[in-house]
A protein has these predicted regions:
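Core RecA-like ATPase module of SF1/SF2 helicases and allied nucleic-acid translocases
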Residues: 37, 66, 85-89, 93, ...
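Walker A/P-loop
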Residues: 24-46
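Conserved interdomain hinge at the start of the Helicase C-terminal
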Residues: 195-220
Length: 383
């Protein structure tokens, strides 16, 4: 999957941040920036430089999700991977305690209970964190994060490369508390987000699936994001029935979660079922699925909003934005938590964004100005 940006294609601020971090490896560093400004890309280039440093540097990379861990691994060469330890935050306890420095992405989501473990790994932290994208209830407080990293050199990225102005305005029209620092620029193009009103859930899911397959290409996969694993099951079941898949699809929701720190592949059964039926669908996240598959064939990745954190895809679909759905599956979700999740989900889109619903639309849909959305019309089939 195309996501990594070559060093010569970085903007000047990104390049300076990398050089400053490499030149000051005995200090803490905090890379900041709006969603899509390239924080993960900066950290990945830092890892590349550290992996080839002489004398050798003992370095660990850590982040919250298996999906983002897998993404980082796909951006490194085999030689670089051999020289870097990579872990989720939950798996840090099994790592060594004498790193020269730890590089950590999505630090706004690190649980409070993991901070003492992180502190034992190294005296030097290089992190990326965007407080607007904090979506986990277990996440540490702002004061705890500041205490863990400061004093630190701050690197503020000001150019938003991933999303265009249309997606930026959609995301910030729903999550109006998103902080945009002065002199921030957003990519300009004519691509407009699309809205589809399904006649039923089946019509909505099948239509969005068919479009996701149509616009997918090698190295430019589509991603269908849904709020919960229960909805992933509904989506898969609907597509399986519509396409006459053989057998009953295993459940995503009931898949066994691995123990902390062990090798994870919780959706092995459902992905084997999809592969057997020659489906381009693949459940990605939690250690299951592979981004490498999209390098050689059309893929449609199926994920929860939470699992998509930190990733980006050429084509992003957000179905089931229907009146009665909560975007945060845990009970007692606040309005702010749902808005942050919508913000995170929409800002995964690198080229195309599709929103859809059936029956009555979710309140967030009604908050988006009409001029930001164009009506999606079904593609005519060629027989």
């Amino acid at each position: 999957m195309k996501w990594m940006v070559e060093i010569n294609d970085l903007d000047a601020v990104q390049a300076r941040a990398i050089e400053n971090i490499i030149d000051n490896q005995d200090e803490n560093h905090w890379v900041k920036g709006f969603a899509g400004s390239g924080k993960t890309i900066v950290l990945t280039h830092v890892l590349k430089r550290l992996a080839t440093a002489r004398p050798p540097v003992k370095v660990c990379f850590a982040t919250f999700t298996h999906a983002l861990k897998d993404l980082i691994e796909s951006g490194l060469t085999k030689t670089e991977l051999d020289r870097i330890d990579i872990s989720t935050f939950n798996g840090l306890g099994k790592m060594r305690n004498d790193y020269d420095l730890v590089v950590a992405d999505e630090m706004q989501d690190i649980p409070s209970r993991v901070l003492p473990t992180l502190a034992k790994k190294s005296d030097v932290l290089v992190i990326a964190a965007d407080l607007d994208q904090s979506i986990y209830r277990s996440a540490c407080s702002v004061s705890e994060l500041n205490a863990a990293i400061k004093p630190a050199r701050e690197h503020q990225l000001r150019e938003i490369h991933r999303i265009n102005e249309n997606v930026f305005e959609i995301a910030t029209s729903v999550y109006t508390d998103a902080k945009v620092v002065s002199q921030t620029t957003v990519r300009q193009d004519d691509e407009q987000a699309r809205m589809y009103e399904g006649a039923s859930m089946r019509d909505e899911f099948v239509t969005m699936y068919e479009e996701a397959v149509r616009v997918s290409a090698k190295e430019s996969p589509s991603a269908v994001l849904l709020p919960s694993k229960a909805l992933l099951d509904k989506f898969i079941s609907t597509i399986a029935t519509a396409n006459s898949y053989t057998g009953t699809p295993p459940s995503v929701k009931d898949s066994e979660r691995p123990e902390i720190g062990e090798q994870a592949d919780p959706f092995k059964e459902i992905n084997a079922y999809l592969k057997k039926n020659k489906s381009p669908l693949q459940v990605f996240g939690g250690g299951s699925g592979s981004l490498y598959d999209s390098d050689t064939k059309k893929m449609v990745y199926l994920m929860t909003y939470h699992s998509a954190k930190g990733l980006d895809f050429a084509n992003v679909f957000l179905p089931h934005l229907t009146e009665d759905v909560s975007l945060e599956p845990m009970k007692g979700a606040s309005d702010d938590q749902e808005r942050r999740l919508f913000f995170v989900a929409t800002t995964r889109a690198r080229e195309r964004l599709y929103l859809s619903y059936h029956d009555e639309p979710h309140r967030f849909i009604e908050e988006i100005p009409d001029y930001l959305l164009e009506t999606f019309n079904k593609q005519k089939r060629n027989y």
